């Protein structure tokens, strides 16, 4: 559950799996990844070097580790239902399917949201993470991460990339 180790390890595994699939003859015509998976996709598509990807992922993990607060919950509902119920301080971190999303953010505000979810018959489960990733709580580290990213060489993709960001 410690992001400082988990993120680099996830990247290494995802990149290695992608390289193995390519070695077996799988020829992707488009790449997609979520969170750390986007770094693996960028690397496999030739947009960034493995060395730069490791630097980005490791620095990202260190910055996010320093925040170390907040909660994440998997919520069984549609975005259109959740958005009006979502208080300030929480974010939709991921839309995994039409009726399964992840809500992330401030721990105290999350408790209020969970009460609202209970009142509306919405089921949920806590994700065991060390912080509220993909939420507004990560905003304080954006400037520092941008400084790291400015040092990286980005190349045109050799394989198309589908971003999971909106």
Q: Residues of each region from the PLM?
A:
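A generic local secondary-structure boundary/capping motif
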Residues: 91-93, 151
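Helix N-cap motif at beta-to-alpha junctions
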Residues: 79, 105-110
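Conserved, helical-rich catalytic subdomain that frames metal- and/or nucleotide-binding sites
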Residues: 83, 132-166
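Short, hinge-like loop/turn segments at secondary-structure boundaries
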Residues: 47-51, 109, 141-145
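Charge-rich, low-aromatic oligomerization/scaffolding segments with amphipathic character
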Residues: 110-122
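Hydrophobic, small-residue-rich alpha-helical packing segments that form membrane-like cores
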Residues: 82, 92, 110-113
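FabD-like malonyl-/acyl-CoA
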Residues: 1-88, 96, 120-132, 136, ...
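A generic structural motif
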Residues: 99-104
């Amino acid at each position: 559950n410690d992001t400082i180790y988990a993120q680099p390890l996830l990247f290494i595994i995802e990149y290695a799996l992608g390289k193995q699939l390519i070695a077996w003859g799988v020829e992707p015509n488009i790449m997609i990844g979520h969170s750390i998976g986007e770094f693996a996709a960028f690397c496999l598509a030739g947009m960034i070097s493995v060395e730069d990807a490791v630097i980005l992922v490791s620095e990202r993990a260190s910055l996010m580790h320093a925040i170390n607060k907040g909660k994440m919950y998997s919520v069984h509902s549609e975005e259109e239902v959740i958005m009006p119920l979502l208080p300030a301080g929480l974010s939709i971190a991921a839309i995994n399917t039409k009726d399964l999303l992840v809500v992330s953010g401030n721990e105290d505000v999350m408790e209020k949201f969970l009460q609202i979810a209970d009142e509306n018959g919405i089921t949920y489960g806590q994700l065991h993470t060390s912080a509220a990733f993909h939420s507004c709580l990560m905003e304080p580290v954006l400037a520092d991460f941008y400084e790291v990213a400015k040092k990286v060489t980005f190349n045109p993709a050799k394989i198309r990339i589908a971003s999971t960001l909106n």
